[in-house]
Amino acid sequence: MLTAIRKNGLILAVFACVSTGLVALTYALTAEQIQQQEQKQLLQVLNQVIPHKYHDNPLAQACTLVNDDKLGTAKPMHAYLAQRDGQPTAIAIETIAPDGYNGEIKLIVGIANNGTVLGVRVLAHQETPGLGDKIDLRISNWVLGFNGQQVTADNQDDWKVRKDGGQFDQFTGATITPRAVVLAVKKAVEYVNQHQQQLHNQPNPCEGQ
């Protein structure tokens, strides 16, 4: 009886070791593939918010981490630093709209050195399908309305949805979501405008973050 129990225990132990080994092997074989896919997706987004003509450096690697209340979170946000012929040209910065209808909305905003918005994309959100999800370019082209915009002392009131007297469309039945995104983009542009030189001079510690 005792021998049988020991035998069964040994079999289970061997099975557990083999299973663990297979899981580890599978992870090792797929980790690089997953990393390559994530890098590919990151590059696609970066090239949407900072067009190719603005950079000839490896944008995904030219990254620094920043903390500021204007970015909507206490967590470090990634900023990607574009250069052309060795000269700074633009910055793509992550930011959070903390007051979306269903929670935080994570964005990335591309901003040229003259303060012009080059592109905005939604990285993550939980907004209501058919209503607030129109911030996603896969659903509507609303987010393209930021292209070419600037934030200046004279146009502060324009950076609101139309319902609040601004220039950006709200969605039928969903004003909270676009209002949150407009404010988050505005603050991100203001942050970059104020810290542009500092950002371009920061080291690039993002690898593995």
Curated annotation (Swiss-Prot):
Membrane topology, from the record: Single-pass membrane protein
A GO term from the CC aspect: plasma membrane
Stretches assigned to the Periplasmic side: 30-209
Residue ranges annotated as Cytoplasmic topological domain: 1-8
UniProt keyword annotations, A-Z: Cell inner membrane, Cell membrane, Electron transport, Flavoprotein, FMN, Membrane, Phosphoprotein, Translocase, Transmembrane, Transmembrane helix, Transport
EC number(s) per entry: 7.-.-.-
GO MF terms held by the record: electron transfer activity; FMN binding
Enzyme class: translocase
Subcellular localization(s) per the UniProt record: Cell inner membrane
Subunit structure and binding partners: The complex is composed of six subunits: RnfA, RnfB, RnfC, RnfD, RnfE and RnfG.
Record protein name field: Ion-translocating oxidoreductase complex subunit G
Source organism (scientific name): Vibrio cholerae serotype O1 (strain ATCC 39541 / Classical Ogawa 395 / O395)
Lineage of origin: Bacteria, Pseudomonadati, Pseudomonadota, Gammaproteobacteria, Vibrionales
